[in-house]
Amino acid sequence: MGKKNLYLLGAILLVVAAFSSCASQPDKAVIERYFHAIQLNDVTTMSTIAVSPIDIDFKSYEITKLGETKVQPAALPEMTKKEAELKKKLEDHVGPTLDAKDVLDLAKEELDNARTRPAKAAAQKKVDDLQAKYDQEYELHKQLQKDYNDAKSAAAREEEISIFSLGEKEVPNIRDLTGEVQSKEAEVKVITKAGAEKTYLFQLRLYNLKDEILNRTRRGRWVIPDIKSIS
């Protein structure tokens, strides 16, 4: 075999090896594609890879740590259930909170109408006791409201990432789909154009979900739900 043919064969083997590496590590490849898109200022591609894409100033980068893949059941059905339960708790507590406020307001009227010192003292004690009870109910209601808001936001975020991984614009029954979610973290060291060193943490996820009613499997792709600077 001639020297020219040997060079050609070597080049082909390098290309095949590169493609094989990407195929065997699609999670790593998605980070590489993201940085390539940044390099080209290709915002459209960045937006198809990351849920919330950010521009990163870099001259060079290196994936310094690629964590183990964690596999967990799809969380969205349980998150949706929790959201509904907290919503009901919040709604059920509206009545007791308003009742406590009404009783307190009546006690304050009694205090305003009290004329004798003993009557005023008794009315004031009643107001103080009812105020404490109302404050307790109000603080509980605020906590229930916070818990519900947090659960609602978390479920909405999970829904967004699930649909993004599936590559769909919308999936009407996404909250009912079962299946599994693969996740991992990657640390990327970046040298900026000014020569500074920074480290970014990439969250990676892949959703493989199943519609139990239609007996249909929906296979997702590795995506980047979050990127943050850690140093």
Segment roles from a protein language model:
Residues 1-20:
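Sec-dependent bacterial lipoprotein signal peptides
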Residues 23-25:
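Bacterial signal peptide processing site
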Residues 27-31:
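Nuclease catalytic cores
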Residues 42-57:
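Short, well-ordered alpha-helical segments enriched in acidic and aromatic residues
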Residues 54-72:
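Short, charge-rich amphipathic alpha-helical segments embedded
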Residues 74-91:
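Alpha-helical linker/edge segments of TPR/alpha-solenoid repeat scaffolds
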Residues 88-231:
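Exposed beta-sheet edge and beta->alpha loop/turn motif
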